[in-house]
């Protein structure tokens, strides 16, 4: 059988960017290289590129919620065997329309296929097709958000279809769980002292100081706008079904740092399965969530991160955001015959750049309490994904869904 592997969110936050920089040069390869032991047996690898490649003149990442990575990031992705990426996510427009265009140009130059975002004059194939063995695949990707509230980049006129939107550009798509009255009172007091509203980064730091971080949840389902945006999904699916044996949906949607999928993402996944997709692989929550078979189709509500900086102040450690999934589709005779997954961890050691390490490889290097803690975390992630208690003695390279 052939093996298709799907990864989650590939990000470069400010801490990671600083770690891989040396005298103005950047080297991401050592950070991603350990993943090769998971990916070397894969025949095709897909990931979510959650950063523009807008060039140095646009300013590399220095803010937590506005990304731009050096082109050499793509060299590292090629090095570990990534064949295709989705560019449709909430950071697609962090450097505006021009950054979107340059991103796909850089990917073309390095030979990585892409889908989800397009220049305004694009007249090619919006669906990504690829063939592995005797099976032809179609990959359709989209995003529920492009951070309009932060970057204020709109998509109108000829640019209305430059991003595969699953929710209107101007909408949020997630709401925060209610905060305790004590925080609201403190926030009002601090803003009164400063004479202005706190920006997102400041209010997030205040939550952390008060030890009350909160996950977000996408429980709002605005049916009218959903149906309007869903129309392109239906059209692309119909086209893909005519031309491919296996059609995969790769949406960017969910509540950040929430270990449970929200109603919006659950509804969208259900609609995708009803439409006929052969598998759904979502991301954006920055933590792993459950997976299940719906009508016999594998559905992962969040694959988690590939390269989120451990310890980022706005993350919620309790949800284990430093662990991510690599989902493997074993295919033969034009069908998905089996689904497995691997677990890896983003490891940060003092004085060296973050590394992304498969948990079985990492386990072999640890001793004592560190070994026990890793095993406990892997067990928690496994149970969260499968709904089953673990039955293995040590962390494994792959697990059956």
Question: Predicted regions: what is each one?
Answer:
Residues 1-401:
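Acidic, metal/ion-coordinating pockets
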């Amino acid at each position: 059988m052939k093996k298709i592997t799907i990864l989650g969110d590939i990000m470069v936050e400010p801490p990671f960017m600083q770690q891989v920089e040396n005298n103005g040069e950047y080297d991401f390869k050592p950070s991603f290289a350990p993943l090769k032991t998971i990916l070397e047996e894969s025949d095709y690898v897909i990931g979510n590129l959650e950063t523009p490649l807008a060039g140095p003149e646009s300013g590399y990442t220095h803010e937590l919620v506005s990304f731009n990575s050096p082109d050499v990031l793509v060299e590292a992705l090629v090095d570990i065997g990534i064949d295709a990426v989705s560019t449709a996510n909430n950071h697609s427009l962090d450097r505006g329309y021009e950054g979107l265009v340059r991103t796909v140009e850089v990917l073309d130059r390095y030979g990585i296929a892409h889908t989800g975002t397009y220049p305004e004059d694009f007249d090619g194939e919006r669906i990504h097709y690829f063939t592995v063995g005797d099976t032809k695949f179609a990959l359709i990707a989209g995003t529920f958000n492009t951070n309009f509230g932060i970057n204020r980049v709109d998509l109108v006129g000829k640019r209305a279809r430059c991003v595969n939107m699953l929710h209107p550009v101007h909408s949020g798509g997630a709401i925060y769980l209610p905060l305790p009255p004590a925080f609201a009172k403190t926030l009002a007091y601090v803003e009164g002292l400063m004479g202005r509203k706190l920006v997102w980064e400041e209010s997030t730091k205040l939550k952390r100081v008060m030890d009350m971080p909160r996950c977000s949840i996408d429980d709002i389902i605005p049916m009218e706008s959903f149906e309007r945006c869903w129309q392109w999904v239906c059209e692309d699916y119909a086209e893909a079904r005519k031309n491919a044996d296996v059609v995969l949906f790769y949406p960017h949607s969910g509540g950040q740092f929430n270990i449970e999928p929200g109603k919006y993402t659950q509804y969208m996944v259900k609609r995708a399965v009803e439409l006929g997709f052969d598998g759904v692989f979502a991301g954006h929550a920055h933590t792993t969530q459950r997976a299940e078979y719906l009508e016999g189709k594998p559905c992962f509500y969040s694959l988690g991160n590939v390269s989120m900086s451990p310890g980022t102040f706005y993350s919620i450690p309790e949800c284990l955001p430093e662990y991510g999934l690599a989902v493997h589709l074993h295919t033969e005779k034009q069908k998905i015959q089996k689904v497995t997954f691997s677990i890896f961890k983003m490891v940060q050691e003092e004085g060296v750049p973050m590394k992304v390490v498969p948990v079985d490889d990492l386990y072999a290097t640890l001793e004592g309490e560190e070994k026990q803690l890793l095993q406990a975390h892997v067990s928690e992630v496994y149970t969260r994904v499968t709904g089953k208690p673990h039955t293995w003695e040590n962390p494994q390279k792959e697990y059956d869904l």
